[in-house]
Amino acid sequence: MKTSRLSTVPTSSSSTSTSSSPSSSSGSGSSTNTVGSRLFTQTKVDNSPLDFENEKELQKKLDDIVSEFRNKDKEWTFRLKALQILQRIINGNGIEFKGWSSMLRSISPALIEQLTELRSTIVKEACASVSLLGFRMKSKFEPFALQYTQALIRMVPVKTTIISESAHQTLKDILESVSTKNLLQTFLDASLDQHNEQLRKRCSEYIYIVLSRAIENDGMILVSSVPALEKSIQKLLIDGASETRQMARYCFWAYSELNEKSATLFYTHFTPTTQKNLFTVQEHLKGDQLEFCEKLKNSLFEEEQHQKMVEDSNDLDFDLNDFKKDNNNNNNNDNNNNNNTSTTRSKTPTTGRASGLKIRSSTNTTPTTTTTTTTTTTPNKTQSSSSTSLRSGSSIGNRTEVSSSIKRPLDASNIIRSKSSLGTTRKDVITGGSGGGGGGGMSTSSQSPISKTPTTMITKTASSSSPNLATSTQSGRYSSIGTRAITTSLSKQSSSSNLTRSLPPIIKSPISPPGPTPPAPTLTKSKSTPSSPLSTPTPSKLSSSTNTTTSTSTTTTSTTPTRRISSSTTSSPIGSTTTSALKRPSTLTSTPKSSSSSSSSSSSATLSSTKTPSTTATNSTTSSATKKSFITKTNPTDEQTTTPKSITKTTTTTTTANSTSTSSIKRRSDNVDEIDIESLEISLNQDNKLAFNEISDEISNNLRDAKKGLSFYEKELTLDDLENNNNNNSNSNSNSNSNNNSKRSSVSSFTNSIKESTTADVDFNWLEDSVHDSLIDDDVLDFDENNNSTYIPRNNNNNNNNNNIIKEQQEQQEGEQQEERQQEQILDEDDELMF
């Protein structure tokens, strides 16, 4: 793009012409007086250059011009004449002096004031002077170009045409005259102005001039300005003004000539519309820009063709299920031969939601219908005579469950339709000795092998003018609106078998081998919440159904409030206790065991109760009632036997069930051995007290050592004394119960099981449990005279050792202090001698 300069630039010394302005040749109201004639036509002005002999005369003349610029009291014509004189000085030999740069720096502020003047004539002459400076000084004007550019860029968006056009032309002259590396950033910032369309349009021209000069000359654009340049071009390409967008396209192709690689990447950031519009200026491009444009266009065309081929290949979507249809059909035929009652779906046109269309088949039936269906099922095939399917008037879809091994199409003429719009379910109802589920809202077809027997179901006739009264086997949401079909009641045997099949698997009880006592199951006691007076056992742990199963359970009944055994097991305020089911051991025992081994888990529970000091209150020997545990004896039979001698259920007892519990005890008294739990509790409480005393002594010793700052190794806890005490207690208990041999043997075996559990679980975690602060103090803890007497000497020895260590440390400190005092005395004596 070629830029035109102002005609005020002199070409020779005799440049004064006698051409008159159009206004002088024509009247003042002539239409030929245009802006272009006023800008680019010369009036009768003396533009002859002024030459000076020395710098003093030049300095004096410039001072006079500056004084005229700053004198605002006089008319504006004096400033106009001063500007014309400045133009003559610039055309002269004044710019050749060495001090011209400093002189120009002194007059620049005054000249910039004239550029921002409100009077258009003054601004036009000032712009002509600045253009002349750039043309004459070339690169020497570069230090001054930035400050003049910043002043001129503010005059570009002015609405006065003479001012804006003069400033615009002056800026283009400066860009053509000097290096633009320091000026580009000013135009880039102005091009992003969102409020001034005229300024964005002018800045796009300035950017194009800078890019054009950068193509011809090096060093016109700084590398640091490239990101801002790309951002500016991208914004200008989508500007609201068409002229601005057009100039921005030229800027892009000029930028592509500078850096082809960056321009290609920059091109991908544009929208498809912007990319397409970039090629609208292809006809006006020349040289390398045109070559790059054609190359980019060809590459885009190839990419488009490749993308089209990819899309065509994606349209060829093969469904692998089509290739597997034959295999699926073969598999279905094999399954039908193996299972004669397998359900197959008839091939019917898709309706309802599956197809999106409401298809209704034509029916040839009359409003009054009498339907008789006879279905005969044989082991090989199923034959149906006068088969009539019932379907409601729904367009939602059809769900078919036909018990047949032969596929046959659905006869639309035999379909009876109701007014319901809820859908339909077609199926053959088969009743037998042990058929499908009974007594439900929706009938389900059974696929069990029992249905192989020939069965016949004759539906009742229904005569009505409405199809809703036709016989139907549907119920629930798929039933007709008018009436529902009368379903035949199942037999007692089929109901029992269905109920048995629907229940979860039953936990079978262990079979006890022959011996004095059966294998002892684990008895666990659960807490009953006060909110529910009766708690029922879960079906997964105990069997309370009507099925005939074998189970061995332990029932604990109580007619009076139970005495609390330990703090871990508490009774409900209402007085109801719940016993859970007995757990079956993994393997059957080959040797008989004593009945006292059934309390292994109970003993572990009572051992855990020793962690809290509240168990000391459980030593009372009197109770309101005696607790008794009843264990049912069963003879050894096969696991598949279904008739045990006794079947017991776990029950929840309340305070009002006195007579019931008493009668149940009498009925089971023949096969039950009684165990006195009180004797067991006494022995357990004594053992627990011994263990608690031993652990408490160890804790108190550790706390004393910690207070005195001494660390001892953690001592492992041994329960040898506990075992000896257990033996003594068991002997005393056996002597006290000499009249009852069975009781004595059960108690001794029970204590033996306690010793086994205690020796196995040596690793206690007593420190994690809570201990009353009142039991831990500096005094010796005397829980028992006999048990804790052995620990007092140990504590005394520890105290003596600690006192000895403290005394030795104090003596050492006193000795060190005496030595320091002696040294201080010696130093004081030396100081006195010196003085």
Swiss-Prot record:
Composition bias, Polar residues: 396-406, 415-424, 449-477, 631-640
Segments of this protein annotated with the region Disordered: 1-38, 317-477, 489-668, 721-750, 810-835
Domain of life: Eukaryota
Residue spans of biased composition, Gly residues class: 432-442
The protein's name in its UniProt record: Uncharacterized protein DDB_G0280205
A GO term, aspect molecular function: microtubule binding
Composition skew (Low complexity), residue ranges: 7-37, 328-351, 361-395, 489-510, 522-629, 641-664, 724-750
InterPro entries reported for this sequence: ARM-like, ARM-type_fold, CLASP_N_dom, TOG
One cellular component term from this protein's GO annotations in UniProt: spindle
